[in-house]
Amino acid sequence: MPRASRDGVSIYYEHDDGDDTPVVFVQGVGYGRWMWRWQREAVAGDYEVIAPDNRGTGRSDAGLPPLLPRLPQKLRTPVMFKLAGYSIEGLAADLEAVLEDVGVRNVHLVGASMGGMIAQQYAIDYRRAKTLTLVCTSHGGPDAAPVPEETREHIFDVPKGANKRERMRHRMRPAFTERFTNRNPHLMDRIIEWRLEQDATPAAREAQAAAVLGFDVSEEIRSLRVPTLIIHGTDDRVIPAVNARLLAETILETRLELIEGSSHCVFIEDADRVNEALGSFLDEHE
């Protein structure tokens, strides 16, 4: 099993051979490698693929002090998480450790939600990004549209007595349209199982969420000179689609693909359209 190491924390990644420049897939808060299965299948063979588990997710180490997960939530602070490597800068440094371990020079970097934030930070701090694909994400900062209050309330208003699967299903609802979940009950059940197998521990998920809250590259990305594809669902109830337009206005060389009526998990809900846009963009810059 390939692993990289940074500051004593082991970062797991998968590496599939291909003919062209590696495509690197970076996940959102708490999500495991499963979330990119549709896109990985679409580029497999033509492109080399690298898929790391973010710190605290899947087979990667959490790197959290042993006592921290046992502390009452109100005593856990963003500073504690940051010292344990949970800032967007720290997660981008983990990604650099992976790419250094693989030994690649240039990559097509694809990130969704928090993964899109890591991708932006990586492109600013390091020099391997040949292109960026930013899905359902934001540049952060005071101008970015935050998670809607209605979504926040839903995520934290978990029904009493719900078991682990029921809690996960409840919290996941805002990430999909009701139309999609009603039409795909078996897939939603499978996603729950994938999440139980690969997702972050509760403490690591909290640490990743704290990293997102501290993210702001709204000024730095103005000087970014990397071809960028921006994909966003117009009905995203987690990171509103206005953030895609802000990114397109701020990054110099961009292509904006708004997918009408799609959700935060647009890469699942409208995988074919995302794959078509991604494949065309990668081929253009290969």
Show the residue positions of the predicted features.
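Gly/Ala-rich beta-loop-alpha elbow adjacent to hydrolase catalytic centers
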Residues: 111, 115, 119
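Conserved alpha/beta-hydrolase "acid-adjacent" motif
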Residues: 237-243
